[in-house]
Amino acid sequence: MADMKWAVAHIKSSFNNTIITVTDITGAETIAKSSGGMVVKAARDESSPYTAMQMAGQLADQLRDKGIHGIHIRVRAPGGNKQRSPGPGAQAAIRAFARAGIRIGRIEDVTPVPHDGTRPKGGRRV
């Protein structure tokens, strides 16, 4: 198993869309990518768990064709001033990769967290 080829799946999941990009280990070369709009046509369905499962299944097939059998996963939420928890598609995509027979190495959260950044939107509350 030492000669098994690995890749990195970057899952950006918000409540409006889910985007999955698969790169090589260094992150330099994009191997495959998919977004909610490439799978469903209704905008309201782009972030759904079903759409994320379909995307992950398609990407798993592409990875197998290219000889990649294992992935490390980096989950990202909108972050910054916005939501710090990933949308509904993130967990569904991870489970779909596992069910498709792709080995999963590390799972890490790479949501950007501000070190006291800009002022959040909304009025002042007293």
Curated annotation (Swiss-Prot):
Instruction: Cite the entry's keywords alphabetically.
Output: Ribonucleoprotein, Ribosomal protein, RNA-binding, rRNA-binding
Cystine connections: none
HAMAP family the UniProt entry points to: Ribosomal_uS11
Q: Which domain of life is it from?
A: Archaea
Q: Which GO terms describe its molecular function?
A: rRNA binding; structural constituent of ribosome
GO terms under biological process: translation
Q: Which organism is it from?
A: Methanosarcina barkeri (strain Fusaro / DSM 804)
Listed SUPFAM superfamilies: Translational machinery components
Name of the protein = Small ribosomal subunit protein uS11
rRNA-binding as UniProt keyword:
yes
Q: Its function?
A: Located on the platform of the 30S subunit.
Q: Which GO terms describe its cellular component?
A: ribonucleoprotein complex; ribosome
* Keyword Ribonucleoprotein on entry: yes
The UniProt entry's sequence similarity note says:
Belongs to the universal ribosomal protein uS11 family.
Task: Note the subunit structure.
Answer: Part of the 30S ribosomal subunit.
